[in-house]
């Protein structure tokens, strides 16, 4: 059983206790830790939407330490990151593998980071199905469709050609932060907080 620390704050109404993750959400910090699955994705999506409602112009920071997980759950987080108004900066702590690497790469341009000793891994989606030949063919085609969609997302956020993305994604590809930066998965490797560029107010483009 995982022990979650409790933080006690003094307020004008007395003491108030938060679990550590809820307290960090108040600072606009969201954690993506462990396998990505539907329940976790629902919580993260809710946090993103809540923080947007609190302040639609202030950055949200997402810390990622995940081996990956369910593609549909990860894409629900990805779509919400793109949907909301605030910039979402991403930071890899530990590892960002599979869907974790996609979320890391999906951060706002110029605000995708990794700590020095993290690792990033990308690969194509996998799956298995037992049943009649026709059903197996249906599921195989779906996996190929998802593979194409994920490749297009990496292409969009890294600036690499689709052909290069397909080559990199063919097998498990592990990278240190420096290689991930050269590949376009992140923008910067940071060792200290002062190196992290977080904008309090998102600069809106003027329509002329």
UniProtKB/Swiss-Prot annotation:
UniProt xrefs under InterPro entries: ClpP, ClpP/crotonase-like_dom_sf, ClpP/TepA, ClpP_His_AS, ClpP_Ser_AS
GO molecular function, one term: ATPase binding
Entry's localization field: Cytoplasm
Gene Ontology annotations of biological process type: protein quality control for misfolded or incompletely synthesized proteins
Record's catalysed reaction(s): Hydrolysis of proteins to small peptides in the presence of ATP and magnesium. alpha-casein is the usual test substrate. In the absence of ATP, only oligopeptides shorter than five residues are hydrolyzed (such as succinyl-Leu-Tyr-|-NHMec, and Leu-Tyr-Leu-|-Tyr-Trp, in which cleavage of the -Tyr-|-Leu- and -Tyr-|-Trp bonds also occurs)
Gene3D superfamilies: 2-enoyl-CoA Hydratase, Chain A, domain 1
E.C. designation(s): 3.4.21.92
CDD domains, alphabetized: S14_ClpP_2
Enzyme class: hydrolase
Keywords on record: Cytoplasm, Hydrolase, Protease, Serine protease
GO cellular component: cytoplasm; endopeptidase Clp complex
The keyword Protease is assigned to this record: yes
Active site positions: 98, 123
Family the entry assigns: Belongs to the peptidase S14 family.
Biological role stated in the UniProt entry: Cleaves peptides in various proteins in a process that requires ATP hydrolysis. Has a chymotrypsin-like activity. Plays a major role in the degradation of misfolded proteins.
PANTHER family cross-referenced by the UniProt entry: ATP-DEPENDENT CLP PROTEASE PROTEOLYTIC SUBUNIT
The protein's assembly and partners: Fourteen ClpP subunits assemble into 2 heptameric rings which stack back to back to give a disk-like structure with a central cavity, resembling the structure of eukaryotic proteasomes.
Protein name as it appears in the record: ATP-dependent Clp protease proteolytic subunit
Species of provenance: Wolbachia pipientis subsp. Culex pipiens (strain wPip)
